């Protein structure tokens, strides 16, 4: 039987993780062993559990305890705290309307190294300073659907485990292997050392079309996407093996990074190419 705790006061310290700590505070870089994240909705929480994430506590609508949450709770220790209230009370507490009426505080998993997640990969995505959590989530969803084996991110970009990012990804951030690129060495050199060629998605005249057969024939290819607005840094483009552009019409010169990723992943991912 789950440890159901009806909410009687907003000031209970155990609710800080849901109501008063920012996501940056939850990351807790000074104490990574105790770092946390918040997963939202039964689907996302279920995929986090599938990925081996450890649940710490729940916050949910009272009606979901024996409804949508029942299967999720059956997978968790019986003594895990489950804080409950009606939806309007939860909205007052958190400041937003819960998707499917459920949040779960979970322990952040330890990240693997670039070499560990890329050794057997053939198609990976590199995200340079992509800042919007919604874009991060959409990119992960496309990566999962369209045959990308891993995602690498620069440290300045948005965290894939932010609540909005994991929700928009439909939980695929727990299915697609990912990690951060090292800041003390050239990540291009790291990827070249692992056998990857790099393809920068950039708005330049001296580019290959996305359908160029040389890209599809590469046994190991990293698709490199840049930040919203400015795109990739010039130095990044110059150090990549290819520069690639999506052909467009009607005078449109660019796509949102999440939309561009879907097009690129479809064309170059393992789903489309027998590489």
Segment roles from a protein language model:
Residues 7, 37, 128-129, 154-155, ...:
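Glycine- and other small-residue-rich loops at beta-strand/loop junctions that grip anionic moieties
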Residues 4-9, 81-86, 176-186:
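Short acidic-hydrophobic, aromatic-tinged amphipathic segments that line or gate anion-handling sites
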Residues 1-71, 157-158:
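Boundary-proximal intrinsically disordered activation/regulatory segments immediately upstream
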Residues 109-206:
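RNA substrate-binding interface of SAM-dependent RNA methyltransferases
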Residues 102-104, 142-146, 157-173, 234-275:
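Structured adenosyl-cofactor binding patch, chiefly the S-adenosyl-L-methionine
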Residues 199-252:
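Active-site/ligand-binding-proximal alpha/beta "capping" segment
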Residues 67-79, 236:
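Short, aromatic/basic amphipathic alpha-helical patches
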């Amino acid at each position: 039987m789950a440890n159901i705790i009806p909410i009687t006061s907003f000031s209970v310290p155990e609710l800080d993780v849901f109501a008063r700590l920012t996501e940056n505070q939850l990351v807790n870089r000074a104490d990574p062993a105790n770092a946390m994240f918040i997963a939202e909705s039964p689907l996302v929480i279920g995929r986090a559990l599938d990925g081996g994430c450890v649940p710490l506590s729940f916050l949910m609508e009272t009606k979901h305890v024996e409804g949508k949450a029942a299967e999720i709770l059956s997978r968790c220790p019986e003594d895990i705290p489950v804080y409950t209230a009606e939806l309007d009370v939860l909205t007052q507490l958190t400041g937003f309307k819960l998707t499917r009426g459920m949040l779960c505080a979970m322990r952040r998993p330890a990240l693997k190294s670039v070499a560990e997640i890329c050794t057997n990969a053939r198609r990976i995505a590199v995200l340079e300073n992509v800042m919007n959590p919604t874009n991060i989530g959409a990119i992960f969803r496309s990566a999962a659907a369209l045959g990308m084996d891993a995602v690498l991110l620069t440290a300045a970009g948005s965290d894939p485990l932010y609540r909005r990012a994991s929700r928009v990804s439909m939980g695929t951030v727990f299915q697609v292997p990912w990690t951060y690129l090292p800041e003390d060495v050239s990540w291009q050199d790291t990827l070249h050392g692992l056998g990857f060629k790099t393809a920068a998605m950039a708005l330049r005249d001296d580019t290959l079309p996305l359908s160029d057969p040389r890209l599809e024939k590469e046994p190991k290819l990293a698709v490199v996407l840049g930040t919203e607005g400015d795109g990739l840094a010039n130095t990044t483009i110059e150090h990549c093996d290819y520069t690639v552009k999506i052909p467009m019409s009607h005078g449109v010169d660019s796509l949102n990074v999440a939309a561009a990723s879907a097009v690129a992943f479809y064309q170059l991912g393992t789903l489309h190419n027998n590489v």
